A protein has these predicted regions:
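Q-loop/switch helix immediately C-terminal to the Walker
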Residues: 81, 87-101
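Conserved ABC ATPase "signature" region
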Residues: 95, 106-122
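A short, proline-enriched helix->beta-strand linker immediately N-terminal to the Walker B motif
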Residues: 144-148
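Conserved structural motif at the start of ABC-family nucleotide-binding domains
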Residues: 2, 17-19
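Catalytic Walker B motif of ABC-type/P-loop ATPase nucleotide-binding domains
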Residues: 150-154
Length: 182
């Protein structure tokens, strides 16, 4: 279970949100909705451990983020367009990320690229990617290590109709797995 209890966050003296209490359950679609600038991305960053709450606690599977562990574990994360190296290819970027945990092979990465229709462009330099191609690469980096938690901030942005359907199908399959969070 992922939960926030009494979580408040401010930035430069401006309160973003106050006393948030929410629980996300496994094997369900969990959404955070709100108008632009309401703090949705900030809330996701708190769950990941990229930012610390002013008050309250964030727990993921009984671990307090910032206390028991600094960052969320076994999670695929796509928040606010992660930057990639412009002069590396899409595959080069994914392989650099894969070196961190060493749990996914080049062939497995390629299969995700194929799934999202990026296989023909995977060796192009990232700086030549369209917005849709960049979004596909972001999604692939989030899912390629088969996490049991996916934290996605506006994952359908810039995707064409076919890629949106592929993503929808992937996510539907993902949440059917035992103890998976979306």
């Amino acid at each position: 279970m992922i939960s926030l209890k009494g979580v408040s966050k401010s930035y430069k003296g401006i309160t973003i949100f106050e006393d948030v209490n929410i629980t996300f359950m496994p094997n369900k679609w969990n959404f955070i909705e709100g108008v632009n600038g309401s703090g949705k991305s900030v809330l996701l960053k708190l769950i990941c451990g990229f930012s610390k709450p002013d008050t309250g606690i964030v727990t993921v599977d009984d671990y307090v983020i910032g206390q028991d562990c600094d960052f969320i574990q076994n999670a695929g994360i796509c928040i606010n367009s992660p930057d990639f190296f412009n002069n590396l290819s899409g595959m080069g970027n994914l392989l650099e990320i894969a070196k961190i945990k060493k749990i996914v092979t080049k062939n497995e990465i390629y299969q995700f690229c194929k799934l999202f229709g990026l296989e023909e462009d995977i060796n192009k330099k990232y700086k030549y990617y369209s917005l849709g191609m960049k979004q596909k690469l972001r999604i692939i980096q989030a899912i390629m290590e088969s996490p049991n938690i996916l934290i996605l901030d506006e994952p359908f942005d810039a995707l064409d109709k076919q890629a949106k359907q592929i993503m929808q199908n992937y996510l539907n399959d993902f949440i059917k797995k035992e103890n998976h969070y979306l």
